[in-house]
Amino acid sequence: MSDAEEEVVEYEEEQEEEDWSEEEEDEQEEAVEEEDGEAEPDPEGEAEAEEDKAEEVGPDEEARDAEDGPVEDSKPKPSRLFMPNLVPPKIPDGERVDFDDIHRKRMEKDLNELQTLIEAHFENRKKEEEELISLKDRIEKRRAERAEQQRIRNEREKERQNRLAEERARREEEENRRKAEDEARKKKALSNMMHFGGYIQKAQTERKSGKRQTEREKKKKILAERRKVLAIDHLNEDQLREKAKELWQSIHNLEAEKFDLQEKFKQQKYEINVLRNRINDNQKVSKTRGKAKVTGRWK
């Protein structure tokens, strides 16, 4: 029911209540008028009532009254108690109130309010169900995202472990190769020491002949001995790969020797500095001891 219809129904109810109140006031006024009409004494009726009373009394009473003498007329007689008749209120025959219509309108109003509440309840329930469905969807989506993130994290961890394993294997391989190279160098050094006498003899002969080589000539000679002619025109693809691996291995060995020599040079330099500092400290101590002895002697 709309607000306009509710206002119309309320206005009709107020009008009906006003009509009822006016009718009740009219009925009360009519009842008061009837009571006033019954309260007024009718002289003719009183006279007839007195006559009937006198007839009922009889001659004996008249004789008794005659003996007693005349009664004083001026004495007031007690009045009868008046009980008004209660008249039920009458419903006027004019415009009658349709209680069925009022009840029906009230029922329709209650029914409309109940229908509105039911619709609001179902709308709220529908919204709650939609929110619950959306919440479940978000939970499932978040769960899938977490599973994907966990899978990516596991893959990255697996790749990292593989890289660490490969790096560890590569280091072990390099360490083994370095040890093998060290053993080879040691063996080569021992073999060179065996032929050291030939080198000494060759140097003595060169010294005797008076021919002295400069450092640049020595360097060129050493490089010429080490550097070989690269003949790769007659090699196929596999042989070229093997040759490239061999050259790379030789470069790697040279770099390793260079690194070892640099570390050895640093160590020797450090030892020289340590020895020099020790010598300087010993010299200072010896000088102070000598001065102390001289001063003590002169005292």
Curated annotation (Swiss-Prot):
Processing after translation: Phosphorylation at Thr-214 by PRKCA induces significant reduction in myofilament calcium sensitivity and actomyosin ATPase activity.
One function term, GO molecular function aspect: troponin C binding
Modified residues (Phosphoserine): 2, 209
Pfam families registered for this protein in UniProt: Troponin
Biased composition annotated in UniProt, kind: Acidic residues: 1-71
GO annotation, cellular component aspect: cardiac myofibril; cardiac Troponin complex; myofibril; sarcomere; sarcoplasm; striated muscle thin filament; troponin complex
UniProt cross-references to Gene3D superfamilies, sorted A to Z: 1.20.5.350
Modification sites for Phosphothreonine: 205, 214, 295
Domain of life of the native organism: Eukaryota
Example of a GO biological process term: regulation of muscle filament sliding speed
Region (Disordered): 1-97, 137-220
InterPro entries referenced in this protein's UniProt entry, alphabetically: TNNT, Troponin, Troponin_sf
Basic and acidic residues: bias regions: 137-185, 204-220
Entry-annotated residues carrying N-acetylserine: 2
Keywords linked to the UniProt accession: Acetylation, Muscle protein, Phosphoprotein
Similarity section: Belongs to the troponin T family.
Its biological purpose: Troponin T is the tropomyosin-binding subunit of troponin, the thin filament regulatory complex which confers calcium-sensitivity to striated muscle actomyosin ATPase activity.
Name of protein: Troponin T, cardiac muscle
Species in which this protein is naturally found: Rattus norvegicus
